[in-house]
């Protein structure tokens, strides 16, 4: 193919996308994976305001947030403090900031009590886990069963990259979540940041036969085609718009993805709204 023909085809493709790109500005957007700052950070208030300001500029209507302890693995006191701050943020930004309950499932009794407090008393919308344990370790099972009872999702840190093994020996990946889903098909698991580094194509393929596992689109890796492959392989109902605080890259990724408007509506907000509605239902 000549360069002229290639360029002509690209222009036609871009022209065809233009209406959809314009339409995305009017679509509701909910970031299903965001973080507010731990209060040990001196400028945490400014950092949180900056996140909201960026969300305003990028037309993100709501952010599902957690606050993580910089000390890991977090103690029970650590995660309770983080969730207290999260509840304060939800009160400061009602309807704009939605809360994940951050816990370390190694504290089995404390985790159960904290999830109950956050979900049933403070109005949080889900649970956030880091890499303290693989998602398939039995220590997680009581928590997973509790989330099934409460009809809430677990947003789980994830990666599939060989270079993470030394610093994160218990990091889960798509295959780990698929295995967990076979044990608990009723659980709602969100595999974090397809664009967070590592082999994202492997991640998408590994989740194909795990229908209860969702994939969020966050991260800073700029590869093209991530969202399209995820929607094509998993179906639009299982892909969730997210930024993980990489807002410009993540918004650009979802707004420029070659999707039908119906699929884009699902990915940008409809799917996470449907997940949250299960709790209210």
Language-model-detected regions and their locations in the chain:
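Conserved, mostly hydrophobic/aromatic
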Residues: 33, 55, 86, 147, ...
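Alpha-helical scaffolding within the catalytic cores
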Residues: 46-51, 81-85, 113, 173-177, ...
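Catalytic pocket-lining loop regions of alpha/beta-barrel enzymes
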Residues: 122-126, 133-240
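Active-site neighborhood of phospho(di)ester-bond hydrolases with catalytic His/Asp-centered motifs
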Residues: 30-32, 65-66, 100-102, 128, ...
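Mobile, glycine- and charge-enriched loop segments
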Residues: 25-41, 98-101
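Glycine-rich, proline-tolerant flexible connector loops at the mouths of alpha/beta enzymes
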Residues: 67-78
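Mid-to-C-terminal alpha-helical segments outside catalytic/metal-binding sites
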Residues: 2-21, 27-32, 45, 49-62, ...
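Active-site gating/metal-coordination segments in enzymes
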Residues: 61, 77-162
């Amino acid at each position: 193919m000549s360069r002229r023909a290639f360029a002509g085809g690209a222009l036609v493709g871009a022209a065809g996308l233009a209406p959809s790109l314009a339409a995305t500005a009017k679509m509701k957007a909910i970031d299903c994976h965001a973080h507010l700052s731990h209060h040990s950070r001196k400028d945490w208030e400014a950092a949180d305001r900056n996140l909201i300001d960026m969300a305003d500029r990028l037309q993100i209507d709501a952010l599902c947030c957690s606050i993580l302890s910089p000390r890991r693995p977090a103690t029970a006191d650590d995660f309770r403090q983080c969730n207290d701050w999260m509840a304060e943020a939800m009160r400061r930004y009602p309807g704009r900031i939605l809360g994940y309950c951050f816990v370390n499932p190694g504290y089995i009794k404390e985790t159960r009590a904290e999830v109950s407090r956050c979900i049933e008393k403070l109005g949080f919308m889900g649970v956030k886990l880091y890499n303290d344990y693989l998602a398939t370790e039995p220590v997680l099972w009581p928590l997973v069963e509790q989330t099934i009872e409460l009809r809430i999702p677990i947003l789980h840190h994830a990666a599939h990259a060989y270079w993470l093994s030394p610093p994160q020996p218990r990091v889960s990946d798509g295959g780990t979540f698929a295995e967990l889903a076979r044990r608990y098909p009723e659980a709602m698991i969100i595999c974090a940041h397809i664009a967070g580094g590592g082999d994202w194509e492997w991640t998408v393929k590994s989740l194909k036969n795990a229908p209860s596992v969702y994939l969020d689109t966050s991260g800073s890796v700029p590869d093209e085609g991530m969202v399209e492959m995820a929607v094509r392989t998993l179906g639009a109902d299982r892909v969730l718009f997210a930024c993980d605080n990489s807002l410009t890259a993540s918004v650009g990724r979802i707004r420029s993805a070659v999707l039908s408007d119906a699929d884009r509506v699902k990915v940008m907000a409809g799917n996470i709204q449907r997940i949250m509605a299960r709790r209210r239902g």
